Regions:
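Acidic-basic catalytic patches of nuclease active cores, encompassing PD-(D/E)XK
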Residues: 2-50
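Active-site beta-strand-loop-beta-strand hairpin of nuclease catalytic cores
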Residues: 58-76
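Short hydrophobic-acidic sequence motifs that mark active-site Asp/Glu residues
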Residues: 64-68, 116, 135
Length: 142
């Protein structure tokens, strides 16, 4: 866990499916649940509870991944993946790295060899009956 690497972006993937997470009216919590559902849909597993409403802890294969969820207001429904990437500055990366390391230290098992921090934006447009999710993998990785 002592070496930080630069991540090469992956090719954007567009997938559509019917969301099943209920909408409760608590926008931040709803966005976190929709992010969890979207990540599950693309193979993320073993979700764990975190003390933060806007942070998910899960795994992609054996890799522990900590995910920040950015709830985007409906006015930002046209936000693109590039827009999300532009919001990930040094402060976000440092915060993500700290979340990853804190999660690793709080776990009961041995420290993992690798950690990763991702960022997911979620925008719910109830009028259109649509949700837009963007996922930046590897905003930080050790």
């Amino acid at each position: 866990m002592s070496q930080t690497t630069t991540i090469t972006p992956t090719v954007p993937v567009r997938e559509l499916w019917e969301a099943t997470a209920p909408v409760t009216g608590d926008y931040a919590r709803d966005c976190a649940e929709l992010a969890r559902e979207a990540l599950s849909h693309v193979g993320f597993t073993r979700f764990e509870e975190t003390p933060f409403e806007d942070v998910l802890a899960c795994r992609e294969g054996d890799l522990p991944v900590t995910v920040a969820v950015l709830p985007v207001p409906v006015e930002g429904f046209e936000m693109t993946l590039a827009d999300l990437e532009s919001l990930i500055d040094e402060d976000v990366v440092a915060h993500g790295a700290a979340l990853c390391v804190g999660r690793a230290l709080a776990s009961d098992g041995p420290l993992p060899e690798r950690l990763r921090f991702d960022v997911v934006s979620v925008c719910v447009n109830l009028d259109a009956g649509r949700v837009r999710v963007h996922h930046v993998r590897g905003a930080w990785q050790s």
